[in-house]
């Protein structure tokens, strides 16, 4: 018998899905994985990118779906890499970011969860986490986790066992889950 899901998570990034699935399961939401590459517009707004991606995802999936877009915004680099974080990570990686950051290491991670169903009206859930860029790679996480130290912490995301409770993604997914569960009542 096929598994039934409440909603799908559309992405080509299995790490994002696994993190989202674990978080949403705490709220009783069954999340399926719709593995797909989505059209991503070149835009400096995470919200606009997420909104476009979730419409693309719904048109492909034909089921209630969420997408996530996030970015690392570094103060001393005027918010760079921001919405271009994925591309920048693929090209220069964490070591490249560490070389670019000066004395001001303040940064924030922002996340947007976008939901769309048959109404075709995207609903967005946004959050951010302030912190600093570490001086070197710490831990074995994926993406920028080994260089981002959340505010009031001494370890990077990659080193924190409780990362899922502190992350920008967790905060956005929690907002979504509360809305989704109330919508179902």
Task: State the predicted function of each range.
Residues 2-8, 15-185:
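Anionic-ligand binding patches
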